């Protein structure tokens, strides 16, 4: 596929203009601009479960990529004005002004270092000390399409570790949305084609539907057991169970796993 054809498919000119405009804005201004431009059709359930103040972690599944962050921002700003995101460090490398809303994380193992990890934890500690709302997509990667269904990737245990260390309540959030067929076609071909479509996948979602379901809050005291086991249970609860049974608590869900085991 030639570059001109690819650029035409991906609306490169429009994407470039938007990216250049965002370079002049702070993170919060950028999120507001994108939320206004995209005007998602949001189907929100359980927003009253989100505390209006105090430190907390919103732990969400990751179906589409950048659009997930904008959709969550659009929902949370109805209740909170202090939201920050754990997000790929590339966002801050592209625009250093995003530090007002992004705690940079190196999700890829080959990009990590002890110094970068310490800096991420330092910034997270500051956010919790300021009693902020911290959003984490613990997979760090988009869900995969398998046999026509989206499968959430494995979660990093950071979300559980932070909740315990910072004594932060977790608000589970199930998101339901899809990318375009073009994205999934490219994703099957190779990772490079998949990755260059991500900004296009954000901008092509104008007036698209997002379902956002908040589950009952999870206390750090509910996160008993090994970090690996708790993280896996939390992933399955948020990505799958919560979308089907929005009123089930995490503790009740874990009890069913014990009974089945």
Q: Which sequence ranges carry the predicted segments?
A:
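Membrane-anchoring hydrophobic helices of lipid-metabolizing enzymes
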Residues: 1-59, 69-71, 78-80, 252-261
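Catalytic core of membrane glycerolipid acyltransferases/transacylases, capturing the structured
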Residues: 9-13, 57-113
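A conditional alpha-helix N-cap/helix-loop micro-motif detector
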Residues: 24, 40, 113-118, 152-153
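Short, conserved catalytic or adaptor-binding loops enriched in Gly and charged residues
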Residues: 32-36, 94, 202-205
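Short, charged beta->alpha transition segments
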Residues: 41-47, 88-91, 120-127
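Residue-level detector of flexible, active-site-proximal loop/helix-junction positions
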Residues: 49, 90-92, 109, 177-179, ...
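Short secondary-structure boundary/hinge segments and terminal tails
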Residues: 52-53, 94, 145, 181
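Non-catalytic C-terminal accessory region of glycerolipid acyltransferases
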Residues: 117-261
